[in-house]
Amino acid sequence: MYIMNKKNILLWGLCLCATIGIASCRDFDEVNTNPTAASQDQVLPEYLINRAIIAAQQNPHVAERAFVLYWKTGGHQHRGGGLAVGGFSDGWSSDYYSRMAEECLKPLTDAIAMCEKRIKDGTARTYDKSLQQVARIWRVYMLSELCDNFGVVSIDGYQGANPTYVGAKEAYAYMLTELKEAADILATAPGSDNGETNKLDRAYGYNTAKWRAYANSMRMRLAMRLSEVDATTAKTHFEEAAAAGGITSASDRFEVQEKDGWDDLTGVMSRQWNHQILSPTYSNLVLGLGGVSSATQLTDARYASHIKPADYLGVRYDKHFPLTTTDPSAGFYMDGLPGIIDPRAYKTFIIAGDTENPDFCFYPSWSKAATTTEYKLKDATDKEKDFKTINAKYTWNAWVGGSWGDLNAINDLVQVGTMPRLGLKYRNSTNKRVFFGEWETYFLIAEAAVRGWTVPLTGKDAYEKGIRASFAYQGAGSVDSYLTSQTYNRVGTSVAWDHTTEPAATVTMKCMNGYTGQTENYTYRYPEMKSRLYKAAMNDHLTKIITQKFIANTPWLPLETWSDHRRLGLPFFETPAVEKALDNMPQLTASTYSTVSVDYYPQRLPLPSSIVNGNKPGYESAIKALGGEDKVFTPIYWAKKKQ
């Protein structure tokens, strides 16, 4: 047994006391230091950029409000009410605005300043200059997102003080210059060779060539936004960006991997209670477009008996569906599948009741709503009596939103399971969210060519490359025959670039009379020019381009489809039904709906009350910059104005 002598005990005790004393001092310092706070030396710009890219994905709370309920509704990428009929929620707007300002724009502003400080004081790493440009580029995207929602944005905010605001004209001038300068610097700035740093860029891994391509494509997008209000500025910036080279391949696509759960990387369309139903706009664009038959696309035997002839419209129930809308398909129930449809449609929206399709979405998983396809129509003169039971399995329908008035009491058919809905692959958080696809670059170049600007491709080449890129992304077939098709969709547009013949005002089609059961001829009318915001033509090159851009950008880029319609009035958007007055849209009535106006469509979001009440000088500067009332139907700088 070992026994310490007194000397050893004394020495051990002194050492222990000294150790305890040192540890106590260290513990005291640690207790008085915030364990979650990082010093300026500990924070790296890539951490801040990573935070901003991730937060921009939008957690489910913000995504449901901004991406789904605002953008997809405003951009007509799904069937919805709310914003489409003038409604908005200050809570939704506040949640979105504060999140993007605090979690995206503030970190990016800090990252830019941090890199600048390091460059000036000589402590910068070799790749800090390129990281600074990445932060500038992503900051431009975030500024453009806010500006395109609210019509104004703060450029000098996000540093603690109450900001002032500028309008879209000033904001776009700033953003276009930022993109030009950042892209020019990235042409020569050394990229990161640090593997750990590169992992923090979920889009491009700090590949400077890819970020430069994105900057150039973003510059093309923003330049084109000014095409109707400042063509000179738009042309100059667009031509420079196009010459420098943008996103033109799948490998350059700006996309970020989603993941399941509840955080910023969770899928933006993942909430099961959001139905994501096919919109009449999308349906009218794809029906008849491209000349590819449903029989060619749907080869499984279960579809064969449901496919209808190409000239068949469906069953006419004009006493059960609203007619106070510019939707040319109003009043019909399609009792099967269309004879001809764009091949991307069945890849994006899954046929009602097609539960054998592995991409069928069973959401909400806690009910049978998605798989219930049988409902009743009531007697038009006695809503207590059943008129007909309809099973909508294997059908393709998209009924207009808005006010159905008394028709709600006699039509139970408008349900989750009776209409095509967005495919599961877009909803289950396993996909990559696309912020900029290669197809968009091509469609932008095609539009620039139509405008006579100097670009590296002809309009036809760019247009067809955009379509091919979209088909490849969707895994759709028959693209070669599609590109030569001269068949018109429901709004009078064909695919073939060289086919610009306008359709006749009417065409004779077949339908079944829902009340007599007899097959009849029906005079189908394409939407008249008075029912369109874009009045130049139904089948010119610009209409073709924006039609294809809309289809290709569905469902990932609803803010772009909304912005294109605000800018051009393209593609054709139907008006909501107005069987009874709309509370937030009194300008649209049953007697005026057929002659459309800019204010029949939402133009922006009112500013959050946190700005209205918490920053009055800032709010006053915002309204002055907006140049109009802080309301949903006030057009922003680059948009079409009410005539």
Where do the protein language model's features map onto the residues?
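Membrane-proximal, proline-rich intrinsically disordered regions
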Residues: 25-72, 356-357, 361, 582-643
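Short, hydrophobic/amphipathic alpha-helical patches that form generic packing surfaces
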Residues: 46-58, 343-354, 468, 544-555, ...
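C-terminal structural cap/anchor segments
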Residues: 451-565
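Detector for C-terminal structural segments
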Residues: 555-576, 581-584
